[in-house]
Amino acid sequence: YRLLTALTLGTLLWGCTESGKKAEGPFYIDIESRAQLHDWFRYAPERPIVVSGHRGGMVTGYPENCIESFEKTLSMMPSFFEIDPRLTKDSVIVLMHDATIDRTTTGTGRVSDYTCEELQQFFLKDREGNVTPYRIPTLEECIVWSRGKTILNLDIKDVPLEVMSDFINRLAPANVMYTVRNARQARTYLDRDPQAMFSCWCKNMKEFGEYAEERIPWSQMMAYVGTMMLPDQQELYGKLHEKGVMCMISLAPT
């Protein structure tokens, strides 16, 4: 309850000025270098709560994994976004959480059964199933749009690690980070991109030790610790904070 109250309050505070008046958006986060990205996620006890838009936000009329939805969220508060890259039949990286397009578009079938051009015939749907005028974006379109506006956290689905790493290295965006589920994944990315920033699954002291063993720089990670802060994991949170690592929980239903 306390955490939810703090999150709600933090969200409200983002939209207010010192005079108590509502600030007007958009609320952009301008990251110009990897070093600045690392610093942005540095833990400090006095720092206000940071909000991550799960799949970009889920406002009625605005679909998940959609640039227009990201803009809508940023019109209300500063946020970084967790998004879901997938490969099309012709190896273009697009944004889609599910393996199929049934739930979130007017089409049916697997993402990998369509070329990127073929996917553009379908319209995205919001969380209530309402059809919107928006279409499936490519990851490259999203990255180009995001520069000077926000941070993108890639929760990679079926894109091979080497393909994604080469893609990111080619575009060299300062404001993009990777979600990794274990230390070995982080090390593999780091070997190909030494300045990479990570959202690391780190839910217990065993996993904490594995990141240390793989020599993942603490300055280049944020720790996803689960759906809530647990009393029996206080040692973990303390160790992460000692290393300057920000902890993240998820309040999204899926």
Predicted regions located by residue number:
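Positively charged n-region of N-terminal signal peptides that target proteins for export
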Residues: 1-2
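Phosphate-group recognition and catalysis centered on beta-loop-alpha active-site segments
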Residues: 16-254
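Bacterial N-terminal signal peptides
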Residues: 5-12
